[in-house]
UniProtKB/Swiss-Prot annotation:
Protein name: Chaperone protein TorD
Main function: Involved in the biogenesis of TorA. Acts on TorA before the insertion of the molybdenum cofactor and, as a result, probably favors a conformation of the apoenzyme that is competent for acquiring the cofactor.
NCBIfam families given in the database record: PRK04976.1
InterPro entries linked to this entry: Chaperone_TorD, DMSO/NO3_reduct_chaperone, HscB_C_sf, TorD-like_sf, TorD/DmsD_chaperones
A biological process from GO: protein folding
Length: 215
C-alpha cells in the first residue's frame, strides 16, 4: 500500500513540475517540438482518462493541434506568454498570488511572505534563474512537487497522513484561493488559448488532487 502511494506521489509531483515549467518561461522550439511527440501525447491521453480532467486536457490538446498550423508558432506563443504574464495586471493575467489576494493588488504582498515562510520551513531552494517573488506560480508549483517527493521518505502511515493534510492545506490556501480568478483573467486575454487551457488544467488538477488527499 505504501509503495503504491509513493509511486502515485511521484506521478503527482511530475505533473506539478511539468505545469510549473509552463509558467516559468517561454517555451523554446525544442520544448515545443516535444509537445508533439508520442511520449507527451501518451501522457496527456493518460490524464484525459480521468473524468475530472478530460475537458481541460482536451482543450489543451486542441491548442497543441492548432499550434501545428500556426505560423511562427514558437514566436507567437512567446508573444502570448509575454502579453499575459510579463506586462501589466490591467491587460494580462500576472502569475502572482498577491495580485489576486490583496486589496491593493500589488506585487510582493502578504501571499509572497506566506510563501517565503513555506519555503523556509521546508528548506526548499527555488530556481534562482526565475528571480521572482516567492508567490510566482512557477515557484509555488515547483515547491509543491518538492513537498510531495519529500513525503516519500516517510515510512509510517500516520506520517504520510500528516503529509497529505499539509499538502492539501497548501493547495487550498496557497493555490485554489486565487487560481480561479487567475484563470478568468487568462480566459479574457489569451486569444489563442494555449496558456488559458493550461491554467484550466492546473485548476482541475489541483481540485482533483485535493479530493484525493482528503479522501
Amino acid at each position: 500500500m505504501m509503495q503504491e502511494i509513493k509511486a502515485f506521489n511521484e506521478k503527482r509531483a511530475e505533473i506539478y513540475w511539468w505545469l510549473s515549467s509552463l509558467f516559468a518561461k517561454e517555451l523554446t522550439q525544442e520544448e515545443l517540438d516535444k509537445y508533439q511527440s508520442m511520449e507527451i501525447r501518451a501522457f496527456l491521453t493518460g490524464l484525459a482518462e480521468n473524468d475530472a480532467l478530460r475537458p481541460s486536457v482536451n482543450a489543451f490538446v486542441d491548442a497543441l493541434n492548432r499550434l501545428v498550423d500556426r505560423q511562427d508558432a514558437q514566436l507567437e506563443l512567446a508573444a502570448d506568454f509575454c502579453d499575459l504574464f510579463l506586462k501589466t495586471a490591467k491587460h494580462g493575467a500576472l502569475p502572482y498570488a498577491s495580485i489576486y489576494l490583496t486589496k491593493d493588488g500589488l506585487l510582493n504582498g502578504e501571499p509572497a511572505q506566506k510563501m517565503d515562510a513555506w519555503l523556509k520551513k521546508h528548506g526548499v531552494q527555488v530556481n534562482q534563474q526565475l528571480n521572482e517573488p516567492a508567490d510566482h506560480l512557477a515557484i509555488m508549483l515547483d515547491f509543491l512537487g518538492n513537498l510531495i517527493i519529500r513525503s516519500n521518505e516517510l515510512e509510517q502511515d500516520r506520517h504520510m497522513e500528516e503529509a497529505f493534510i499539509e499538502q492539501n492545506a497548501f493547495i487550498q490556501e496557497m493555490l485554489l484561493s486565487w487560481l480561479p480568478s487567475f484563470s478568468q483573467r487568462a480566459a479574457e486575454y489569451d486569444e489563442f488559448g494555449f496558456y488559458n487551457s493550461a491554467i484550466k488544467l492546473l485548476v482541475a488538477f489541483c481540485m482533483l488532487d485535493s479530493d484525493y488527499l482528503v479522501g
